Regions:
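Short amphipathic alpha-helical face segments that pack within enzyme cores
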Residues: 81, 85, 120-123
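Alpha-helix C-terminal capping segments
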Residues: 59, 89-95
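C-terminal binding/interaction regions
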Residues: 2-47, 95-164
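Compact, glycine-rich, soluble single-domain proteins
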Residues: 70-84
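Short beta-strand scaffold segments in enzyme catalytic cores
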Residues: 51-60, 102
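Short, well-ordered amphipathic alpha-helical segments that serve as non-catalytic structural scaffolds
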Residues: 37, 82-90
Length: 164
């Protein structure tokens, strides 16, 4: 019963857009800024085939933001998601410590629903973050968003610690 109550309280906190206590770096105002940056990144998406545009904004521990958008290709396999674009961009600049990522997306760039990361992006995130502390923010707007720990989106995950 206690576990079920905790799960319900966690869902209520998330639905209200309140942060879970494990990540002190990310306030509500920071979340809104990340969502705004993700929306701007989404506008740059190249999605001529699916018309589903996605943007992301990745926050480092040093409070620097790297944005990404999805880039499609006619062969589909070489396409890249917004989340991976942001991570690869940050890593190519020497960043290694990340706090959160905000993700938005929708058909023709219209935000109608939450846009969770695909399985490949979840696994890429897992490579570079502590899934118990890293926040994944999925948003419809700056006021309407859900916050998860990566661990909740990718339970029982395989990561670098398994092969070290």
């Amino acid at each position: 019963m206690k576990q079920e109550e905790d799960r319900i309280h966690s869902l209520v906190r998330r639905e209200k857009g309140e942060l879970l206590a494990k990540n002190e770096l990310v306030s509500r105002s920071v979340i809104r800024l990340l969502i705004r940056d993700a929306i701007e990144a989404m506008e740059k998406a190249y999605a001529p085939y699916s018309h589903f545009k996605v943007g992301s904004a990745l926050l480092t521990i040093k409070q620097k933001v790297y944005t990404g958008c999805n880039v499609e290709n006619a062969a589909y396999s070489p396409s890249n998601c917004a989340e991976r674009t942001a991570f690869f961009k940050a890593i190519s600049e020497g960043e290694k410590d990340f706090a959160a990522i905000a993700i938005v997306g929708g058909k023709d760039g219209i935000l109608q629903d939450y846009c969770p990361p695909c399985g490949v992006c979840r696994q890429v995130m897992r490579e570079f973050v502590d899934p118990r502390k890293f926040l994944v923010i999925v948003a419809k707007s700056e006021e309407d968003y859900l916050v998860y720990f990566l661990e909740e989106l990718l339970p029982i995950s395989f990561g670098p610690d398994y092969i070290e």
